[in-house]
Amino acid sequence: TGSRGQYHIHNLKEIPHARIVAVCDNYAPNLQQAVELCPGAKAYTDYRKLLESADIDGVIISTPLNWHAPIVLDALAAGKHVFCEKAMARTLDECKAIYDAYQTTNQVLYFCMQRMYDEKYIKGMQMIHSGLIGDVVGMRCHWFRNADWRRPVPSRLRGKPCKPTA
């Protein structure tokens, strides 16, 4: 439920028949923000517990890449529809495992290309496809923004080494 998850929350809230019944994050500040955005949604810190819930039809996975394959596989095994951020997985073996698992289900599995549904990009593609700007023979793109895409690190954690959990 970090920045990407909250982006999806805002989009889901625009869909009349969509209901956000649960949110999950192991980072408390992000989870709290998501709970505030989704009154009535149950909060989870462990995605496996969320997947056990019978009132959840599908999940949106917007975790760091190393978690995509495990969560997608667990969600498919739990009978959930899956919408996952790109990239599909870290390795070809993980991608194959996801594909093989998907083939055994009747679930929807979709991998999101972040800007594919952004109005600015859609308008640009419409202009290209309509011929309005002529033949495109080259393109250069720069992306400037005034915020860091990574989640903030609380000041109490800055400069401290990570400790193994096991």
For the regions a language model picked out, list residue spans one by one:
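N-terminal Rossmann-like NAD(P) cofactor-binding module of classical short-chain dehydrogenase/reductase
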Residues: 58-60
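Glycine-centered tight turns that cap/initiate beta-strands
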Residues: 17, 40, 55, 132-135
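Predominantly a Rossmann-like dinucleotide-binding segment in NAD(P)-dependent oxidoreductases
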Residues: 107-110, 115-166
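N-terminal Rossmann-like dinucleotide-binding module
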Residues: 1-38, 118, 128
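Conserved SAM-binding strand-loop segment of SAM-dependent methyltransferases
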Residues: 40-47
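Beta-strand-loop-alpha-helix segment that lines the small-molecule cofactor/substrate pocket
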Residues: 64-65, 69-117, 131
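Short, solvent-exposed loop/turn and secondary-structure capping segments
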Residues: 7-11, 33-34, 71-73, 94-95, ...
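Short hydrophobic/charged patches on amphipathic alpha-helices used for structural packing
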Residues: 47-51, 125
